[in-house]
Design a protein with these regions (language model features):
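Extracytoplasmic
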Residues: 9-73
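Short glycine-/aliphatic-rich beta-strand segments at the starts of folded cytosolic domains
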Residues: 1-5
Length: 73
């Protein structure tokens, strides 16, 4: 499980957010191609259990990123 804080078309934007979120754990940028377009996903984790991810999700949302969500690869 991961907490996805956002997905961006600009790599610099994703890395900027990732650096800010390191206070909540292992934040990183993962590249993804969707419909022929490259996106840079900012994710925290991995977490072994969804409950662990939910705790971090609450912290990220309290930080102001309301559209963050728990995802599973």
């Amino acid at each position: 499980y991961f907490v996805q804080a956002g997905a961006f078309s600009k790599q610099d934007t994703a890395h900027s957010l990732s650096r800010k979120l390191t206070q909540f754990g292992n934040a990183r940028v993962a590249e993804a191609d969707v419909d022929g377009k490259r996106f840079y996903r900012v994710r925290l984790g991995p977490f072994s259990f969804p409950e662990e991810a939910e705790v971090t999700l609450a912290k990220v949302r309290n930080y102001g990123i309301q559209n963050a969500s728990v995802v599973r690869d």
